[in-house]
Regions:
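Rhodanese-like catalytic fold shared by cysteine-dependent sulfurtransferases
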Residues: 1-67, 71-155
Length: 155
């Protein structure tokens, strides 16, 4: 499970396998935590959020079944976004209050590649909000599909 961390927080990774621990370490490095000392293997790994694939996200949006939260930074979103998505950079979720974006629908978080979406979904789940991340792919994969993608200033 991912959580929002401060730069000086100590991190302890619990994992079922070495591969799972390595995957967690890669995710932490992807968001700027470069000094990792190790991990602890456990028999039962923590509860996880089930990821959403791009194709599933398309269907959920067609059915108006979810709210998409774009957790990228403003300059990234300015390059383009999914119409109807809510913008909330992942690093601001705690400060702004996770409940400020809850509207009764399940939430799907998305970023450029998946790392920040995983963190954001975990913050939301910890706040009692039904949230799932797009972990495999992200905005680039959405942009590559034939589904609607809006560039800022294009209406």
């Amino acid at each position: 499970m991912s959580v929002l961390l401060e730069p000086d927080d100590q991190i302890l990774v619990h994992a079922s396998t070495r591969e799972e621990a390595d995957r967690a370490a890669r995710g932490l490095r992807a968001v700027g935590f470069l000094e990792l000392d190790g991990y602890v293997l456990t028999a039962d790994a923590s509860e996880r959020t089930e990821p959403v694939e791009i194709g599933e996200l398309e269907r959920l949006l067609d059915d108006d079944a979810v709210t998409v939260v774009d957790v990228r930074e403003k300059d990234e979103r300015d390059a383009g976004f999914i119409p109807g998505s809510v913008h909330m950079p992942y690093r601001l979720l705690r400060a702004c209050g996770a409940h400020s974006i809850a509207n009764g629908k399940p939430i799907v978080t998305i970023c450029e590649s998946g790392a920040r979406a995983g963190i954001a979904a975990s913050v939301l789940v910890a706040a009692g909000i039904d949230a799932r991340p797009v972990l495999h792919g992200g905005i680039d994969d959405w942009r590559g599909n034939t589904v609607e993608f809006r560039r800022c200033g294009s209406g």
